[in-house]
Amino acid sequence: METPHQGTALFHLPGLFEFYDLYAAFLPLYRAHREYFYDWCAIGSIYGAPSDCLWAGGRVECSDRTPREVLALTREYGISARLTLSNSLLRPEHLTDPDCNALCRLFQEQNDPQNGAIVHAELLTQYLKKNYPSLYLVSSTTKVLTDFNDLQRELARPEFRYVVPDFRLNRAFDRLAALPQSQKDKVEFLCNECCWFGCTERRACYEAVSRKNLGLSGPEHYCSAPGAADGYRFSRAMVNPGFIGIKAIRDTYLPRGFTQFKIEGRGLGSALILEFLLHYLTKPEYQLAVREELYLDTMLDLF
C-alpha cells in the first residue's frame, strides 16, 4: 500500500474477522493493479472483533478466523488493524476477561503498523490506556454524538486519536469548518449509514448488542424506522441526508481538511462490502475488471 500523503482520504473498512476471505482476495489485487483504484485515497484500517469477544459492541461478527490470521494479513499489506471494543455496558469485573486481554496483548505486540481499538465505555478507555498504551484509541460512533458541543469535547480529549461522530453531524459544515486543523485530523466520518436520519433509537440498538455480547437479559431491540423491514440497502443509504460519497469526499471534505472516513458494514454480506470497495476505492472504468478478478466468470449463475 502506498504511503498516504497530505490530502489523501483514508478509508476504515469493516469486518476484520468477518470478511477475511474477501480482503484476502481483494488486497493482492489492490496492490498489483493500483491503476484500477483512485490515487487520492488509501486504506487506513480494517476494523472488527472475533465473534466471542466480550468487550465487542456495535454489531455482532461471525467468523472462525483467528486473531493471528487476520494480523498476518493486515501486516502483509501494511494496514492498521482495529479491534472494535465498543461494548457500552462493561463493568469492572469484565476487564479481567482473559480472552480479551490476550487479544489486546497480541495486537499490541504485533504493532507494525500500529494497531488500535474502537471504544465506548470510559472504564475500558482508561484500562486500555494504562495496560495497552501502544494501541491507539478511537471514540466509537456508538456514543451517538449528535450534539456538536459534545463532539468538540470528545475531540479535545488527548487519549483519542480519532472520534467518530453520529452521521447526522456529517453536514454540519459551518461548525466543522471552524475546528482547528488538529481536531479536523481527528474527525472520522461515518459515510454510508442506512439508518433513518430521524432515528431516536440508536443508543437502544447498540445497547441490545452490548447485552448480547455480555450474556445479559434485557429487551430485544426491534427497529421501527421507515423501511426497516428491507434491511440495509446501499441505494437507500445513498439518499440519506448524512451520506458521504466519493464526489463529496473529493470536492468538499478533503479541501476543508478532513481525511478520515469510516465505511460501515459488519453483519452484512460480503457482496455488499465489495460494492462499497467498488464505490469508494475503484475507478468506474475498472469496476468490472475487479469483479472479474474476484468472482465473475462465464460459468457463474445467479438464477
Could you describe each region identified by the protein language model?
Residues 1-150, 154, 160-303:
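Active-site pocket-lining/capping segments in soluble small-molecule metabolic enzymes
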